[in-house]
Amino acid sequence: MSSVFLLYFRNVVLRIILGSCFFIGVTCLSSLVGSSEVLAEDVVPVEMTIQDKKDLKRVAVYLEAIKTLRGGFLQVSSNGRVSSGKIFMSRPGRLRFEYDPPESILMIADGLFFVYIDRDLEQTTHVFLKSTPLSFLVQEKIVFKGDVTVTKIERPPGILQIKIKKTKEPELGSIQLVFSDKPLVLRKWVVVDAQDIITTVNLTGIQTGIKLDPKLFTLPTKENN
């Protein structure tokens, strides 16, 4: 692949998994993805019904019960890019995304940082895990208030969808968690970034409660990268 294409793909991946400026801040990654100035807006919370509150409680209990997770992912962006790979999660705070060839992308969250590694470009990008949308999934206590605001809850047949935004920076985008219902299982998440690019990350072959090597979540050094 050409270096120009690899750089383009790097920016797309950052936008997709990290949510670009969403939950990060305009000055952090906007230069990478060429974002324009983002106008502030007020977050509008959904008017909660009794059923909404019950479902949010169910989701919180479900997510908190997932201590480890392993599976695959299929990533589809509204700009036409499709990628796949493997995902590993160890709560709280640890994630790993391994992209399938020909991409050379690796992402690791070690509890503090979320690190993007492009081996072909020999480039590494660090952001604080708490500034990314995925930090919500791996925090020890799942809370649908405070830093995040629930803006929509929908229930298509057999599905539960919950959309959240950053409470203090809603203009930067949203993440929607999509679950199959009865039993409750996380199936995918959908990120809409500040440039209105929509990215869906579908989970496949998910296993939970399995033993994972702690080294999966160790940040690579020059010797082992």
Residue ranges, per PLM feature:
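An acidic-aromatic
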Residues: K86-F136, G205
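Sec-dependent N-terminal signal peptides
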Residues: N11-V26
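N-terminal secretory signal peptides that target proteins for export/translocation
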Residues: M1-L14
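Extreme N-terminal tail/first-helix region
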Residues: D42-L63
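Surface-exposed, polar helix/loop patches in the mature regions of secreted/periplasmic/lumenal proteins
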Residues: D118-I164
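A short, Trp-centered hydrophobic/proline-enriched beta-strand micro-motif
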Residues: V61-G80
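C-terminal segment of classical bacterial N-terminal signal peptides
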Residues: F23-E37
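Gly/Pro-enriched, hydrophobic low-complexity segments
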Residues: K145-T149, R155-N225
